[in-house]
Amino acid sequence: MKPRFAFSISATDGAARAGVIAMQRGEIRTPAFMPVGTAATVKAMRPAEVRAAGADIILGNTYHLMLRPTAERMARFGGLHKFMGWDRPILTDSGGYQVMSLSALTKQSEEGVAFKSHLDGSRHMLTPERSMEIQRLLGSDIVMAFDECPPAGVDARRAEASMERSMRWAARSRAGFDAGEEHAARSALFGIQQGSLDEKLRARSAATLIDIGFDGYAIGGLAVGEGQAAMFGVLDFAPAQLPADRPRYLMGVGKPDDLVGAVARGVDMFDCVLPTRSGRNGQAFTWDGPLNIRNAKFADDQEPLDASCGCPVCTIWSRGYLHHLVRAGEMLGAMLMTQHNIHFYQDLMQAMRDAITTGRFAAFRSDFAARYRRA
């Protein structure tokens, strides 16, 4: 019988870890990058293409799905997996970040967040209990606790108050998750560390989460405008504050060099809209750095996006053809650019897993930094 949730570390190299998360719907190799399926789709890609690119798990957005098509409707279809045709693990976020960043007229209280939908202005209330209910209706494999994510640059008092509220919501999320006994028996719940950039606040947050008890732990409150140096500053201490025998998930990150730097600091899981959003806007990620295929210099370029990439896009089509598709606004352009980017991100994760396993991660990191030119 497949386990509900089990995490094993197969190799370490410095703080970097390679391992496997085993769940009933399949294994997730770590370090792992999760393509984002905001509205029950990884934009511009079919599920089979996402899997063929190397993804073991994708992410779904509770906020977007609760508004359209609604969690209750997806439950009638048999859950998010059947609805979208993806049979492997899905992690769903709690909806807290999107509520604060996308919704108009939000009102926070100890109970939760009251908000108006950005789609039609309808009124909703999202609480830890409702977030757990929605994620249960979706049939999520990895459920995220409901938290409050303050913007970058908040003062110490606001950061502390926000962290403490998130910890109270974490306890309510735990109780709400456990109340759904049938779903809880086959899925996992992750807690989210908060505390802004403050080491002591994050230590308190981690201690509280560990006391509550979770299957995995996320590092929240980053990638909100603080910049890479500040983010890495937090990652120099935050992962070590969390249990070594549980997965560590850095939410909303990020650029390829962010991923390499975070893995070097002990992070196991990532998600970000960047590869899909960038693909739709004509930006490709390559081992030599990002390139904007819209630029006129690519019009006559007969080379692939990345000569060292083995994805279907790079083995068939030229930069010149992709330039034409994107400039002409053809749907295929967004599809092919996205497909390449998802392949590149998964190839990057595999390269890091291999480097950790063979004890050469430091050399890989140095070589990557020397070659990759950040836009």
Curated annotation (Swiss-Prot):
Q: Identify this protein by name.
A: Queuine tRNA-ribosyltransferase
Question: What family is reported?
Answer: Belongs to the queuine tRNA-ribosyltransferase family.
Assembly behavior: Homodimer. Within each dimer, one monomer is responsible for RNA recognition and catalysis, while the other monomer binds to the replacement base PreQ1.
- What's the stated role of this polypeptide? Catalyzes the base-exchange of a guanine (G) residue with the queuine precursor 7-aminomethyl-7-deazaguanine (PreQ1) at position 34 (anticodon wobble position) in tRNAs with GU(N) anticodons (tRNA-Asp, -Asn, -His and -Tyr). Catalysis occurs through a double-displacement mechanism. The nucleophile active site attacks the C1' of nucleotide 34 to detach the guanine base from the RNA, forming a covalent enzyme-RNA intermediate. The proton acceptor active site deprotonates the incoming PreQ1, allowing a nucleophilic attack on the C1' of the ribose to form the product.
Which GO-annotated molecular functions does the record name? metal ion binding; tRNA-guanosine(34) queuine transglycosylase activity
Q: In which residues is substrate bound?
A: 93-97, 147, 194, 221
Q: Does the keyword Repressor apply?
A: no
Question: What PANTHER family does its record include?
Answer: QUEUINE TRNA-RIBOSYLTRANSFERASE (PTHR46499:SF1)
Catalytic activity entry: 7-aminomethyl-7-carbaguanine + guanosine(34) in tRNA = 7-aminomethyl-7-carbaguanosine(34) in tRNA + guanine
- Note the HAMAP family from the entry: Q_tRNA_Tgt
Q: What cofactor is this protein dependent on? A: Zn(2+)
Q: Does the keyword Kinase apply?
A: no
Spell out the residue ranges making up region: RNA binding: 252-258, 276-280
* Pathway listed: tRNA modification; tRNA-queuosine biosynthesis
Query: Where does this protein hold Zn(2+)?
Result: 309, 311, 314, 340
